[in-house]
């Protein structure tokens, strides 16, 4: 039976061959021959190769020009013309051998040279040594780390806190720990560089809204809502985040947090709040922008801040609900793969928190000094003040740009140098021009601390005014 079936199939094949059109048979024959040629032919013929003569080799070597390892850099680049600081960058700072009043370092509460903070750091140094030599998951967790996390959570009135060993890596690690490919992040166009790097690492879909423009943010949220209605299945697994700063590092302006919270609940998004500039500055007790507006901390999904400004230490922290913070212990890159915070710096931060809790009036003092310098700098010829009157890091920008960023920076640097010659230490705000998503205009940054006297604030304003007139007029 099987033999009969095989014969029948063979007959059908022969019959199909006879009935096939001629062009079909020709095409199949050509393809078969081409495949045979590919299988048996060589990729190149040895006889076609010819060796270069010694003279030709020398000519090629002489003509070859290697590409530069790094791009060309101007001799006037700030990184090649740095100032040298001698001693701690406290209230008075010695720059290039000249003593100046410090209006450049982010020592807002003046705790960098506080005797109690230094004593706590020294005691920790004697007990633990300098570093930990390992990440938190590998014998890098010391009892002082747990104490600091507990104190930060208690101070911020959240369930839990987590500390990082470097301030920049805090928000840059926290964002990609939650926001992944396919998620959508709505972020302010003036977001600081650390936020930008976190967004880049997350590989999420980034939507920029105009700086502090709630209407523009709502427009983007509405557009996304319409897109979600077209594909409900995808929308169910797509998370939406709003990322903002309490006080913006690049502009000195405060975020409209009440409006952001309203949009959060209306469009079912999560809020990440970066408070490096507002922690220890805003609010009656220094808890940041949530306390400033009287908003419940539970309305914010994640708060991050560094400890390198108000706390005068190093590192950063995130705080929020326990399940949110615990996720970072497994997914926060800067937490899992970096050596933990040196214990002496954790001890210093704890003592700084003690001082903040014992002396809440310090925040009102800082606010008053910020308002004083903000008012004193109004009307400086050729310069405009950018930032809120309650921000301790103001920006002075040119009223009218020359049309060249390099030229603008050169003019501002001349003002900085003239002020330094008169005993006022300032600095320009520095950016990685080619990597910034929205590059801010050149500016001089003026930093206020509680240690500066009213006389020094007025003197600084007068010095800036004189330097601006000399350079710009």
Curated annotation (Swiss-Prot):
Required cofactor(s): pyridoxal 5'-phosphate
Induction, per UniProt: Expression in increased by palmitate at the protein level, but not at the mRNA level. Expression is down-regulated by microRNA miR-137 and miR-181c (at protein level).
Membrane-spanning residues: 16-36
UniProt keyword annotations, A-Z: Acyltransferase, Coiled coil, Endoplasmic reticulum, Lipid metabolism, Membrane, Phosphoprotein, Pyridoxal phosphate, Sphingolipid metabolism, Transferase, Transmembrane, Transmembrane helix
Enzyme class: transferase
Swiss-Prot/TrEMBL domain comment: The transmembrane domain is involved in the interaction with ORMDL3.
Assembly notes: Component of the serine palmitoyltransferase (SPT) complex, which is also composed of SPTLC2 or SPTLC3 and SPTSSA or SPTSSB. The heterodimer with SPTLC2 or SPTLC3 forms the catalytic core of the enzyme, while SPTSSA or SPTSSB subunits determine substrate specificity. SPT also interacts with ORMDL proteins, especially ORMDL3, which negatively regulate SPT activity in the presence of ceramides. Forms dimers of heterodimers with SPTLC2. Interacts with RTN4 (isoform B).
Family: Belongs to the class-II pyridoxal-phosphate-dependent aminotransferase family.
Post-translational note: Phosphorylation at Tyr-164 inhibits activity and promotes cell survival.
GO biological process, one term: regulation of fat cell apoptotic process
Membrane topology listed for this record: Single-pass membrane protein
Stretches of the chain found on the membrane's Lumenal side: 1-15
UniProt-recorded name of the protein: Serine palmitoyltransferase 1
Inhibition and activation profile: SPT complex catalytic activity is negatively regulated by ORMDL proteins, including ORMDL3, in the presence of ceramides. This mechanism allows to maintain ceramide levels at sufficient concentrations for the production of complex sphingolipids, but which prevents the accumulation of ceramides to levels that trigger apoptosis.
Purpose: Component of the serine palmitoyltransferase multisubunit enzyme (SPT) that catalyzes the initial and rate-limiting step in sphingolipid biosynthesis by condensing L-serine and activated acyl-CoA (most commonly palmitoyl-CoA) to form long-chain bases. The SPT complex is also composed of SPTLC2 or SPTLC3 and SPTSSA or SPTSSB. Within this complex, the heterodimer with SPTLC2 or SPTLC3 forms the catalytic core. The composition of the serine palmitoyltransferase (SPT) complex determines the substrate preference.
Side of membrane Cytoplasmic, spans: 37-473
Keyword Metal-binding recorded: no
Reaction catalyzed: L-serine + hexadecanoyl-CoA + H(+) = 3-oxosphinganine + CO2 + CoA; octadecanoyl-CoA + L-serine + H(+) = 3-oxoeicosasphinganine + CO2 + CoA; tetradecanoyl-CoA + L-serine + H(+) = 3-oxohexadecasphinganine + CO2 + CoA; dodecanoyl-CoA + L-serine + H(+) = 3-oxotetradecasphinganine + CO2 + CoA
Matches recorded under PANTHER family: CLASS II AMINOTRANSFERASE/8-AMINO-7-OXONONANOATE SYNTHASE, SERINE PALMITOYLTRANSFERASE 1
Tissue-specificity statement: Expressed in astrocytes.
Gene Ontology cellular component annotations, sorted alphabetically: endoplasmic reticulum; endoplasmic reticulum membrane; serine palmitoyltransferase complex
GO molecular function: pyridoxal phosphate binding; serine C-palmitoyltransferase activity
E.C. numbers: 2.3.1.50
Pathway: Lipid metabolism; sphingolipid metabolism
InterPro entries: Aminotransferase_I/II_large (IPR004839), AON_synthase_class-II (IPR050087), PyrdxlP-dep_Trfase (IPR015424), PyrdxlP-dep_Trfase_major (IPR015421), PyrdxlP-dep_Trfase_small (IPR015422)
């Amino acid at each position: 039976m099987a033999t009969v079936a095989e014969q029948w199939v063979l007959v059908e094949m022969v019959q199909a061959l006879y009935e096939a059109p001629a062009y079909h048979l020709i095409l199949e024959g050509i393809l078969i021959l081409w495949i045979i040629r590919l299988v048996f032919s060589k990729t190149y013929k040895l006889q076609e190769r010819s060796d270069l003569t010694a003279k030709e080799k020398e000519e090629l070597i002489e003509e070859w020009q290697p590409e530069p390892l790094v791009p060309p850099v101007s001799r006037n680049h700030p990184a090649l013309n740095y100032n040298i600081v001698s001693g701690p960058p406290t209230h008075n700072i010695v720059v290039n051998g000249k003593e100046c009043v410090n209006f450049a370092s982010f020592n807002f509460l003046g705790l960098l040279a506080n005797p109690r903070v230094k004593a706590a750091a020294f005691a920790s140094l004697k007990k633990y040594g300098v570093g930990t030599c390992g990440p938190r998951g590998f014998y890098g967790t010391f009892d002082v780390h747990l104490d600091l996390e507990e104190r930060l959570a208690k101070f911020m009135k959240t369930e839990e806190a987590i500390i990082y060993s470097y301030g920049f890596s805090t928000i840059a690690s926290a964002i990609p720990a939650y926001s992944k490919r396919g998620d959508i992040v709505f972020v302010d166009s003036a977001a600081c560089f650390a936020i930008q790097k976190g967004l880049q690492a997350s590989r999420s879909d980034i939507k920029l809204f105009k700086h502090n423009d709630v209407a523009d943010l709502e427009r983007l949220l509405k557009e996304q809502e319409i897109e979600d209605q077209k594909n409900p299945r995808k929308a169910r697994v797509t998370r939406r985040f709003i990322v903002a700063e309490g006080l913006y590092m690049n502009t000195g302006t405060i975020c409209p947090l009440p409006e952001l919270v309203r949009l959060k609940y209306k469009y079912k998004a999560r809020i990440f709040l970066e408070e490096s500039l507002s922690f220890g500055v805003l609010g009656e007790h220094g808890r940041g922008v949530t306390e400033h507006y009287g908003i419940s901390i539970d309305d914010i999904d994640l708060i991050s801040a560094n400890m390198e400004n108000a706390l005068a230490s190093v590192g950063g922290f995130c705080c929020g609900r326990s399940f949110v913070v615990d996720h970072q212990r497994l997914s926060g890159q800067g937490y899992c793969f970096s050596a933990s915070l040196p214990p002496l710096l954790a001890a210093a931060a704890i003592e700084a928190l003690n001082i903040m809790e014992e002396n809440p009036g310090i925040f009102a003092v800082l606010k008053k000094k910020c308002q004083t310098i903000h008012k004193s700098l109004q009307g400086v010829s050729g310069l405009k003040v950018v930032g809120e009157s309650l921000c301790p890091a103001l920006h002075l920008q040119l009223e009218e740009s020359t049309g060249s960023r390099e030229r603008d920076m050169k003019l501002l640097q001349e003002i900085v140098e003239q002020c330094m010659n008169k005993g006022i230490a300032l600095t320009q705000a520095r950016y990685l021009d080619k990597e910034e998503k929205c590059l801010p205009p050149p500016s001089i940054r003026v930093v206020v601390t509680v240690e500066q006297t009213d006389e020094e604030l007025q003197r600084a304003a007068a010095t800036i005014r004189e330097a601006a007139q000399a350079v710009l007029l």
